[in-house]
């Protein structure tokens, strides 16, 4: 079975700066950061996009958000603020077909 880059990072096949991992969620530094702090929070289970969330796996979104808050506090960006982004499919500019959340912070971010 062909694995995407996130699956390889989750399984330790590709080295990465993993900052959090449990049985459901893995978080690691983005290799092409667009902010001083740019962390990807991904489910360990392959969910290709936000559109694949359903009754059976919807709890994963809550876990992704909760872990993001914990990471923001760990990196001390919770007070000044941070941004969470989920891109969905081609027009949403999702590049890897594995649901992931971008945690951005460490400076005042541009308006969107």
From Swiss-Prot:
Gene Ontology MF terms in the entry: catalytic activity
PROSITE patterns attached to this UniProt entry: HIT_1, HIT_2
SUPFAM superfamilies attached to this UniProt entry: HIT-like (SSF54197)
Domain of life: Bacteria
Motif Histidine triad motif, chain ranges: 98-102
Ranges of residues in domain HIT: 5-112
Protein name per Swiss-Prot or TrEMBL: Uncharacterized HIT-like protein bbp_327
């Amino acid at each position: 079975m062909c694995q995407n880059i996130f699956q390889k990072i989750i399984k330790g096949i590709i080295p990465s700066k993993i900052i959090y991992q449990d049985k459901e969620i893995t978080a690691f530094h983005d290799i092409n950061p667009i902010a001083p702090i740019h962390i990807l929070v991904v489910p360990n289970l392959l969910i290709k996009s936000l559109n694949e969330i359903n009754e059976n796996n919807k709890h994963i979104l809550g876990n992704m958000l909760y872990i993001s808050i914990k990471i923001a506090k760990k990196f001390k960006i919770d007070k000044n603020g941070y941004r969470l982004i989920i891109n969905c499919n081609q027009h949403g500019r999702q590049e890897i077909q594995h649901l992931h959340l971008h945690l951005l912070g460490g400076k005042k971010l541009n308006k969107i």
